[in-house]
Amino acid sequence: MANKLKITLTKSTIGALPKHKLTVSALGLGKLHSTNEVPDNVAIRGMLKQVKHLVMVEEI
């Protein structure tokens, strides 16, 4: 596994489930096309699995 993941919000959270909105916020993403680097661990991978239809993930 990589040390960090680069996450980009590619779809809007308008109309998404409230728990998905909270997950996107917890990942450090706000506006559309915002990007954040997070550590690669099991907790983050679980969060990404929940919102995989809204984000793009790159290993760095």
UniProtKB/Swiss-Prot annotation:
Keywords: Ribonucleoprotein, Ribosomal protein. One of its GO terms (biological process) is translation. It comes from the Bacteria. Part of the 50S ribosomal subunit. The keyword Transferase does not apply. One of its GO terms (cellular component) is cytosolic large ribosomal subunit. It holds the Pfam family Ribosomal_L30. Belongs to the universal ribosomal protein uL30 family. This is Large ribosomal subunit protein uL30. One of its GO terms (molecular function) is structural constituent of ribosome.
